[in-house]
C-alpha cells in the first residue's frame, strides 16, 4: 500500500511539473540571435512571429517572437553579468547593462 501511495504521489508531482512547462519558456540560440524571444505562440502577434527558431520547445507550443524595438538585455531573455558567457554573449545588443558587465542569454 505504501508503494502505491508513493507511486501516486510521484505521478502527481510529475504531471504538475510537465503541465507548468508552457508557463516558463526559455531562450534558445536561434531565436535570440535573430533578436527574438521564445514565447507561447498564442501570445505573439502574427506580424512578429519567427517560426521554427525555438525548436526544442515547439512541441509545447513555444516559438520565436520578434521583440518590440525596446532593446534591453532583459527583453532578449538575457542577464547582465561579469561572468564569461562565451557565445551566449549578446554583442549586437545596445543593452542597458552597467559598465564592466555584459548581456548573456543562458540556454
Curated annotation (Swiss-Prot):
Any one annotated GO CC term: extracellular region
Leader peptide range in chain numbering:
1-20
| Superkingdom per UniProt | Eukaryota
Q: What is this protein called?
A: U-scoloptoxin(19)-Sm1a
The places in or outside the cell where this protein is found are: Secreted
SUPFAM superfamilies, sorted: Defensin-like (SSF57392)
Q: In which tissues is it expressed?
A: Expressed by the venom gland.
At the highest ranks, the source species' classification is: Eukaryota, Metazoa, Ecdysozoa, Arthropoda, Myriapoda
Tell me which InterPro entries the record gives.
Answer: Myo_ane_neurotoxin_sf
Q: Which GO terms describe its molecular function?
A: toxin activity
| Family that this chain belongs to | Belongs to the scoloptoxin-19 family.
Kindly provide the PTM information from the record. Contains 6 disulfide bonds.
List keywords of the entry alphabetically.
Disulfide bond, Secreted, Signal, Toxin
Q: Which organism is it from?
A: Scolopendra morsitans
Amino acid at each position: 500500500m505504501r508503494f502505491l501511495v508513493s507511486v501516486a504521489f510521484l505521478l502527481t508531482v510529475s504531471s504538475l511539473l510537465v503541465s507548468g512547462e508552457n508557463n516558463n519558456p526559455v531562450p534558445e540560440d536561434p531565436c535570440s540571435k535573430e533578436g527574438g524571444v521564445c514565447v507561447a505562440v498564442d501570445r505573439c502577434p502574427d506580424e512578429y512571429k519567427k517560426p521554427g527558431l525555438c525548436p526544442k520547445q515547439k512541441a509545447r507550443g513555444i516559438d520565436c517572437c520578434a521583440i518590440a524595438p525596446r532593446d534591453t538585455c532583459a527583453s532578449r531573455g538575457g542577464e547582465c553579468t561579469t561572468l564569461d558567457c562565451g557565445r551566449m554573449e549578446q554583442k549586437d545588443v545596445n543593452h542597458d547593462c552597467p559598465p564592466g558587465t555584459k548581456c548573456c542569454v543562458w540556454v
